[in-house]
Amino acid sequence: MATQTVEGSSRSGPRRTLTGDLLKPLNSEYGKVAPGWGTTPFMGVAMALFAIFLSIILEIYNSSVLLDGISTS
């Protein structure tokens, strides 16, 4: 037999901690899906703005052709 139970063991289940008690409400919504699109449009806008930001940083770093008409000093 792979597992063995000991009768009369004093194991009472999972141990409660302060951190666990603080984080428990955050996990109570696990698996629930909001109806409709939810915050998807906001996430799309955030991703687009981040992509624009990254392309600007890359263009500045590479001294890209797109920035030839813009003086940086």
Curated annotation (Swiss-Prot):
Keywords: Chloroplast, Membrane, Phosphoprotein, Photosynthesis, Photosystem II, Plastid, Thylakoid, Transmembrane, Transmembrane helix. One of its GO terms (molecular function) is phosphate ion binding. It is a single-pass membrane protein. Disulfide bonds: none annotated. Phosphorylation is a light-dependent reaction catalyzed by a membrane-bound kinase; phosphorylation occurs on Thr residue(s) in the N-terminus of the protein. One of the components of the core complex of photosystem II (PSII), required for its stability and/or assembly. PSII is a light-driven water:plastoquinone oxidoreductase that uses light energy to abstract electrons from H(2)O, generating O(2) and a proton gradient subsequently used for ATP formation. It consists of a core antenna complex that captures photons, and an electron transfer chain that converts photonic excitation into a charge separation. Belongs to the PsbH family. NCBIfam families: PRK02624.1. This is Photosystem II reaction center protein H.
